[in-house]
UniProtKB/Swiss-Prot annotation:
Top-rank lineage group of the source organism: Bacteria
Keyword hit for Lyase: yes
Subunit description: Monomer in solution.
Organism of this sequence: Pseudomonas aeruginosa (strain ATCC 15692 / DSM 22644 / CIP 104116 / JCM 14847 / LMG 12228 / 1C / PRS 101 / PAO1)
Reaction catalysis annotation: D-ribulose 5-phosphate + L-tyrosine = (2S)-3-(4-hydroxyphenyl)-2-isocyanopropanoate + hydroxyacetone + formaldehyde + phosphate + H2O + H(+)
Family: Belongs to the isocyanide synthase family.
Pfam families: DIT1_PvcA
Record PANTHER family: SPORE WALL MATURATION PROTEIN DIT1 (PTHR37285:SF5)
GO MF annotations, alphabetized: lyase activity
Name the UniProt record assigns to this protein: L-tyrosine isonitrile synthase
EC annotation from Swiss-Prot or TrEMBL: 4.1.99.24
Alphabetized UniProt keyword annotations: Lyase
Entries under InterPro entries matching the protein: Isocyanide_synthase_DIT1, PvcA
Amino acid sequence: MYAIAEDTLPARVLKELLLYRRRYPEHRQSASEADEIRRIEQVQLPRIAAFIEAGEPIEFVLPAFPAKSPNPGKVLDSRPDMAERLSLSFLNHLCQRIQLFYAPGAKITVCSDGRVFGDLVRIGDAHISAYQDALRLMIEEIGATHIGVFNLEDVRAFEAQRDNHEQLRQLLIGGYAEPLESIRETLLASEEGLLLYRAITRFLYEDGLTPDYQGSKTALQRDAKERAYGVIQRSWAWGALLADQFPRAIRLSIHPQPADSLKFGIHMMPTRDDWLTPWHGVAVNTEDRFVLMKRSEVLELGGELVQINGQPSHYRLPARAARRAAVA
């Protein structure tokens, strides 16, 4: 067991992360949080300490920010908005807080994964490219100097196929993906695997409920269940590639993770849904803070659209509705 004093630099860094940890909601009552933290410490403290002992910036990677959901019941439109802006600002501020007590600081590489599974989530490559370009511009606009971006087309070994997005996906699958049957077996073998599979299935089902969808909900659900295996296969392949590209980096995740995982699940905005992300929701200005919600939920509460520079940005809730939407 890795033992480390509570007042050491690695422990202080981990405490910053723990403030925003994504936990499985199903585990909140059944698992001891103290026991979970002890298990997290055993995994993460030695990895954080390795950077500090070398006097280097602590390196994080975060597979995230693929593209906006195609469902207008969840998001404003296809462009990054206040939800992304606040999330990127949070990530940059997290690095700044670490730098207050550890001078070399930290850096986070956002590994945008839209290109990885865009065909499976039925978002076109042109939309993914536009989202990625807007995301880079947003990072510059907010002065997020601690954040970098890495995409599938940035992999040096794939450089010859940089403009052939389908071939890039095939190179990823061929080099890093496990067989689909193996993915199925792994997911069905644990509670965490089932939770992930159900969450991805739900995302795909909800994203498919667009105004122009003409099929039955049963057919869409069946299709989402099948595509979910492929999305997870690609996501895990992307993770394996990132482990090659950033072998020492601490892996952050937008999903809840087991306490003994190498991945650390992190919230970028307050939300009642531990699976909701900025690209599946909208930013909502309540009485005292911004929270993340689905657009349809905000509209039911009477949310008022706010535009910035002529573009839809976020929603504002009346005081009474804001109290109903309060996030614990």
